[in-house]
Amino acid sequence: MIKNIILALLFVISFNIHSQESESPNIILMIGDGMGLTQITSGMYSNNNSTSLEDFQYVGLSKTHSYDNLVTDSAASGTAMSSGKKTQNKVLGLDHEGNHIKSILSICQDKGYSTALIATANILHATPAAFFANIDYRYNYKDIAVQMTKSGVNFFVGGGKKYFNSREDKRDLINEMTENGYEFVYNISDYEKSKSNYLGFFTAKDEPYYFYKGVNYSYREYDEPDYKEDELEDFTGKESYLASSTKATLNKLDEIGKPFFIMIEGAQIDWAGHDNDQDYMVSQFLEFNDTIEVVLEFAKKDKNTIVVVTADHETGGAAIVRGKLSDSTIKNRFVSTTHTASMVPVFSFGYKAHLFKGIYENTEIFNKLLSIVNK
């Protein structure tokens, strides 16, 4: 009798382990645009010497150069990570000879995955667009918007509404997408409440705007949006939405019940580097850090999810030159207002996280994710 019970228990344990291994894993790719080690370190010291990245199991380094330039832009680097090919700066979803290449998001869709994109830039910006667009000029937003309508992405969050419905060709892509089953919302509350499996959350007409406070730093107010004050209630405006929309999207993807791929971009870490603005940089990293915490909480509970956190490049050539641990204050200096060729870190947690240790080209991020999808 006891022997039979033990055998039955062993069978159940073996079955559960096998089921988990045979189930396709979820993929969460987080890109801190412009986020080098100094951006991370500055945020960490400003946050009582702590960051959610300390919970990750493995750390690697990625070489960010583009096909013909040591200093990449977000289009070339985004294409390398999304599609596994080096290309020229400003190019999305094409190899260096102009051939269309398939992204990891599209490959995941072919294998039955649900998909999502979230960005604190406009959703057609280079990093998110690298996962669905094939075009030779990253700033051709109106054509990229047309490609977005055909992407099949389940959920997307970001700015850029005007490229869909305020167009010279008079097309209303929002109406076209609505006719094809999409729902659109303009605030986090409606996004959280929606039951649609095809949902767009526009956070601004063009680029999202924020009103942030970094820890121990002063408030900074940014340029006003290009829409009237009476329209502000329809948009997120200056509120942070990355962590809240990520949590809501993970819940939505989980409820669908299929494996999923999601790319989450903290876009404005890069913008702060271009501005050489330490306060802005720290506040943007801290928002990204809060979002990492949300993602880790999901992955730890799910136990069948790979989380990869990396950057497309470093911006600003930032260096911490002085500071105090006692009051979490720091002082950065910048050597550039553009991108640099520094390697960037790759943090990994969860399913087959060990694949991402070491030093490698950024194209290997695609290859490693592909090996997980094709397991």
Give the location of each predicted region.
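Active-site neighborhood of phospho(di)ester-bond hydrolases with catalytic His/Asp-centered motifs
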Residues: 308-311
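Short coil-to-beta-strand
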Residues: 75-77, 198-204, 256-268, 342
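N-terminal catalytic scaffold of extracellular/periplasmic and nuclease hydrolases
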Residues: 20-167, 171-193, 197, 289, ...
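Hydrophobic h-region of N-terminal signal peptides that target proteins for export
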Residues: 9-18
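Sec-dependent signal peptide recognition
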Residues: 2-8
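Glycine-rich ThDP/TPP pyrophosphate-binding loop and its adjacent helix/strand module
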Residues: 133, 140-141, 166-234, 238-241, ...
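Active-site His/acidic residue clusters
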Residues: 126-132, 207, 212-217, 222-225, ...
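A structural signal for short secondary-structure junctions
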Residues: 254-256, 300-303, 337-341
